[in-house]
């Protein structure tokens, strides 16, 4: 309605030209703009296994229960993680899966008490604390998981699907050196969502901030867009 054009492409770099405009490079094209708002979000943190393989992702190993959980209706599944996302995944999966095993590194959850209480009330959920998943096994699809129990014993669990929820990480290297990153890789900005480069703004989970929720991301978008507009107007004066 507002004339925006959407291009589904991966950005591989941003450059500020001598005339003050920005050149945004993607895998296929280059775009020029007077101002840019980075809203790259974050990506799921992948579980490091001893084999280092990622070929089973989408073939039994998943990072989004909302997207892929329904494929395993009536079957047994596993959730790896101990935070809010893992709790939410396990609760969701328990509503249509035969059995949900939750593997956690520690003997407690690091999530909201209300979610923990809800999970504990599910008859088809089994929590296995103090376990460390070390590898995914299978040729063309996942067949089992290798893990170490609290005593360090190597064990195996036959399971058709695993949902990993061990956190999220930013991927902001493409925007260097026009931005500064904190120690965790998030883009540093001020309260106007401006980065260290004039005309370059950032919004959402990819920037340094104390709270990462939909509400704060939407607020960032409004702030960044407003200040990008102000910046463009200043160029015309």
Segments the model singles out, each with a brief description of its role:
Residues 35, 42:
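Conserved acidic
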Residues 43, 49, 54-71, 166-216, ...:
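FAD-site-proximal beta/loop scaffold in flavoenzymes
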Residues 38-39, 79, 164-165:
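Redox-cofactor binding/interface segments in oxidoreductases and associated redox assembly factors
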Residues 1, 5-25, 30-33, 95-190, ...:
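A Rossmann-like FAD-binding core segment of flavoenzymes
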Residues 60, 75-76, 99:
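Residues that mark the start of a beta-strand
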Residues 86:
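N-terminal Rossmann-fold NAD(P) dinucleotide-binding loop
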Residues 81-83:
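Glycine-rich Rossmann-fold phosphate-binding loop(s) that bind the pyrophosphate
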Residues 90-91:
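Generic hydrophobic/aromatic pocket-lining and core-packing "Φ" positions
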């Amino acid at each position: 309605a507002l004339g925006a054009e959407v291009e589904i492409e991966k950005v591989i770099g941003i450059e500020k030209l001598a005339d003050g405009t920005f050149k945004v490079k993607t895998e296929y094209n280059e775009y020029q703009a007077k101002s840019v708002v980075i809203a790259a979000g974050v990506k799921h943190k992948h579980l490091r296994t001893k084999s280092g393989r990622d070929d089973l992702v989408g073939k039994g190993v998943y990072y989004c229960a909302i997207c892929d959980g329904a494929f395993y209706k009536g079957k047994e599944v596993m959730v790896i993680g101990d935070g809010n996302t893992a709790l939410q995944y396990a609760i969701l999966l328990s509503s249509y899966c035969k059995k949900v095993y939750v593997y956690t590194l520690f003997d407690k959850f690091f999530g909201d008490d209300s979610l923990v209480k809800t999970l504990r009330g599910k008859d088809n959920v089994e929590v296995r604390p103090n376990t460390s998943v070390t590898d995914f096994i299978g040729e063309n699809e996942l067949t089992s998981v290798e893990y170490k129990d609290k005593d360090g014993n190597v064990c195996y669990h036959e399971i058709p699907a695993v949902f990993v929820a061990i956190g999220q990480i930013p991927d902001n290297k493409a925007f260097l050196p026009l931005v500064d990153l904190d120690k965790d890789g998030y883009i540093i900005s001020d309260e106007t969502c401006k980065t260290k480069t004039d005309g370059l703004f950032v919004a959402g989970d990819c920037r340094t901030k104390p709270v990462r929720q939909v509400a704060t991301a939407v607020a960032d978008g409004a702030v960044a867009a407003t200040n990008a507009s102000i910046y463009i107007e200043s160029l015309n004066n």
